Amino acid sequence: MQLRERRILLLGAGGAARGAIGPLLDEHPLELTIANRTVEKAELLAGIFASAGPIRAMAFGELQGPFDLIINSTSASLSGAIPTISADLIHPHIAVYDMMYGQGDTPFNEWARKFGAQKIMDGLGMLVAQAAESFAIWRGIRPGTKQVISELRRNLGMR
């Protein structure tokens, strides 16, 4: 997905979010919004990356779209919960990405699909890419990832 000139919403302000912000800003989005239950944590992260690109922070309840991409980096899916954001942020042309993954849709992706999102992705690809990068660091060879991801999805009965 092309991220240049796109409006990106990043849910969560923990370690996973922090690791994603630099690479997201490197793609020159129109704006990156970090939203969190505690806005102070989002503001802290936005402050750290303020010189890297257009970034702002807000509380979940303050969010107003439209966004082109929503990334869920919260741990909510682990407990079957969904971040408390408005379903009005979801529309048919939005891309939704949950850093979590499982055999079926994550609770967040299931919720987004219910409200009309059609492009839905999970974090399995990120997991495999991280493993490939680690392998490259230790072995000097970067393995392909597409076939591994496809095979994992097939073997685990995933979409």
What are these regions, as identified by a protein language model?
Residues 1-7, 91-92:
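Short helix-loop-beta connector
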Residues 10-11, 34, 98:
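Hydrophobic Val/Ile/Leu positions in short beta-strands of Rossmann-like dinucleotide-binding domains
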Residues 52-67:
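Short acidic low-complexity segments
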Residues 72-76, 100-101:
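Short glycine-/small-residue-rich Rossmann-like dinucleotide-binding loops
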Residues 86, 94-146, 151:
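Rossmann-fold NAD(P)-binding glycine/threonine-rich loop
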